[in-house]
Amino acid sequence: EGNKEAEHPTHLVFKKYRKRLLSSVAATMVNAVGFYLVLTYLPTYLTSYTSMEASQAQLATDIALIAYLLIIFGSGTLSDKVGRRRMLLTACVAFIVLSIPCFLMLGTASLPIVIVAELIMCVTLSLNDANIACYQAEMFPTEVRYTGAALGSNIAYVVFGGTASFVATALIDATGNGLMPAFYMMAISAVAGVILFFTAHDYNGIPLDEIR
């Protein structure tokens, strides 16, 4: 038995930790879509579907990104205190509630209002983003930790993150409704929220070598 070949970690993740992998994908899909829509797609959205000039659109996003870099530290500290599950679910609910109001604010093409809208979305995104790395590392045991975290991240980013801008643009072009990116963000958050409600658990505070 001592010479028995170890099972490949990828096979082991799909065999024994499917529920945790699903939870990892759900948490990361909110992050992937939120990150690409809020921090990379919005300058294009603002110049293509509102009357905002490119320089102002980029300025608003730059300000939001700088603020985001500061906000995320506070969200990470809060996550250590209240737990990953609560933070991830709060982010889902916040995106569902705030996405349409924020995109309505973007539609004004007023620089101060656009900055406020982007800051609101950045705070919401930070509630998720500050948790992802820790949540994925904490949910898998040592034997599959790297593989489980990598699979969760890459599946979510390839399927949802990499296509976010394309889907948002396609939905607007198909419907003529400039709020479609908000509806897409809401749908992603709703699906992820349901999955996380039933699959997410808090592992922070448990030594990593004791997670099974």
Predicted segments — roles?
Residues 18-68, 161-165:
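Extracytoplasmic gate region of multi-pass secondary transporters
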Residues 187-212:
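Multi-pass alpha-helical transporter architecture, strongest
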Residues 93-108:
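C-terminal ends and interior cores of transmembrane alpha-helices
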Residues 142-174:
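A late C-terminal transmembrane helix in Major Facilitator Superfamily
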Residues 168-187:
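A membrane-interface helix-boundary motif in multi-pass transporters
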